[in-house]
Regions:
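Cysteine/selenocysteine-centered motifs that mediate thiol-based redox chemistry or coordinate metal-sulfur cofactors
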Residues: 17, 36, 104-123
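A short, polar/charged loop-to-alpha-helix boundary motif
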Residues: 92-109
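Residue-level signal for alpha-helical context at structural boundaries
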Residues: 44, 98-99, 114, 121
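A short, polar/proline- and glycine-enriched secondary-structure boundary/capping micro-motif
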Residues: 9-11, 96-97, 116-117
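CN hydrolase (nitrilase-like) catalytic-core segments centered on the catalytic cysteine
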Residues: 6-93
């Protein structure tokens, strides 16, 4: 998903069929300014928790041509909302290994998806 999409949980909602999730990883590429980094830091782990999936967010670092500051905070979270990687304000690359078996084990022990109400969005 892209940038501002992080604010809309329904767009990221994992869909389940016969106990299988549509995805195991949410990935956000973003340009969130420093003024809103608190929301970025709160919403990214929330999406991981509510969708029983990993969530990775890559956010911009630096100052743009309009003098707007971007502080990064690129991070990876597991399905429990625990931070696996936090790059803070650094402009760098880091590798993270995600465990599918840990994810599947957690989903089987905590099958919250079974309680989700199916719904559709009308245009």
């Amino acid at each position: 998903q892209i940038c501002y999409d992080l604010r809309f949980p329904v767009w990221a909602r994992n869909q389940w069929k016969d106990g299988e999730a549509a995805y195991d990883l949410l990935f956000y590429v973003a340009s969130w300014p420093a003024a809103r980094v608190f929301a970025w830091d709160a919403l990214l782990p929330a999406r991981a928790i509510e969708n029983l999936s990993y969530a990775i967010g890559v956010n911009r670092v630096g100052i743009d041509g309009n003098q707007i500051a971007y502080t990064g905070h690129s991070a990876a979270y597991d399905f429990k909302g625990e931070r696996l990687v936090d790059l803070g304000e650094k402009d760098q690359i880091q590798v993270v290994t995600l465990s599918r078996s840990s994810l599947e084990e957690y989903r089987s022990k905590f099958p919250a998806w079974k309680d989700a109400d199916p719904f559709t969005l009308d245009s």
